[in-house]
């Protein structure tokens, strides 16, 4: 299976969905999983991306193998058009006011003094997902230079007034501004709900993955469950330009597998 080098777009409301269980996700609240690319019960095949980029629209799994044997996945990039970790960069700060910049891929609105992120289907006009800041988030993550750490501080929780000031900027006014620094990137997520994972292998054997770049994964990480003999070589987990987060949670996660799992010459940045 060859993807001639190009950018390929996959939309949730034009993709296949099936009921299945994924470990470390909420398969009771969200049993119906959506897949951009789903390959089932195939043997002795190669999927060559030829340097292509798979662009995912919606909160779904980018790529999945189920019940496959002796499969090679090579030379492609996975990128989400609107990542479901929501990043806010501090660009201006005063005693009672902070201006945040939001990446261009994430749409948002301010209504009733609440900041809500969303991604809208170009076909139906309905939202693939919505997330109201701190509505489903126990804690946030701060990226400060090379430091990454968790915090209970929030851009919106103590805000007295939230105002959209531009296509990609929002201003929050406070009684006392949270102790963020200019340049900090605060990342929030819907961490009460893991409804899917980014890439998914189930009941597969002898799978080889090489020269794959992952810019982001929704819901969880790259999950392999009940598999045998997995090889990952020259993988790169790195956020797309303008972002700091490369996965909702975890990067490679292996559960209930046997044989070997080999990870070689790879780069992990999260």
Language model segments and positions:
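Non-catalytic, alpha-helical, charged scaffold/linker segments
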Residues: 88-155
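Long amphipathic alpha-helical scaffold regions
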Residues: 227-262
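Extracellular beta-strand-rich solenoid/capping regions of secreted or surface-exposed proteins
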Residues: 9-46, 55-74, 81-96, 192-205, ...
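Long, low-complexity, polar/charged, intrinsically disordered or flexibly structured peripheral segments
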Residues: 128-203, 208-218, 223-225, 232
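Generic short beta-strand segments
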Residues: 4-17, 103, 236
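All-beta strand scaffolds that present successive hydrophobic residues in beta-strands
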Residues: 3, 46-49, 70-75, 182-183, ...
């Amino acid at each position: 299976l060859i993807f001639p080098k190009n950018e390929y777009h996959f939309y949730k409301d034009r993709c296949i969905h099936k009921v299945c269980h994924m470990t470390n996700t909420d398969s009771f609240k969200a049993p119906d999983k959506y897949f951009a690319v789903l390959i089932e019960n195939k043997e002795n095949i190669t999927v060559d991306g030829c340097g292509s980029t798979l662009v995912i629209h919606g909160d779904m799994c980018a790529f999945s193998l189920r019940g496959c044997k002796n499969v090679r996945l090579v030379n492609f990039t996975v990128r989400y058009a609107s990542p479901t970790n929501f990043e806010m960069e501090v660009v201006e700060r005063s005693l009672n006011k902070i201006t945040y910049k939001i990446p261009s891929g994430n749409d948002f609105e301010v209504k009733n003094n609440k900041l809500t992120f969303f991604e809208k289907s170009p076909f139906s006009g309905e939202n693939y997902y919505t997330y109201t800041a701190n509505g489903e988030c126990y804690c946030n993550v701060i990226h400060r230079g090379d430091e990454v750490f968790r915090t209970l501080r929030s851009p919106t929780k103590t805000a007295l007034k939230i105002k959209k000031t531009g296509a990609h900027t929002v201003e929050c006014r406070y009684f006392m501004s949270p102790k963020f620094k200019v340049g900090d990137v605060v990342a929030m997520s819907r961490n009460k709900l893991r409804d899917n994972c980014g890439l998914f292998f189930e009941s597969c054997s002898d799978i080889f993955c090489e020269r794959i770049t992952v810019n982001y994964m929704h819901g969880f990480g790259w999950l392999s469950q009940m598999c045998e003999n997995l090889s990952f070589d020259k993988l790169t987990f790195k956020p797309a330009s303008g972002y700091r987060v490369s996965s909702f949670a975890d990067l490679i996660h292996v559960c209930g597998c046997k044989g070997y799992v080999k990870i070689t010459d790879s780069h992990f940045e999260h």
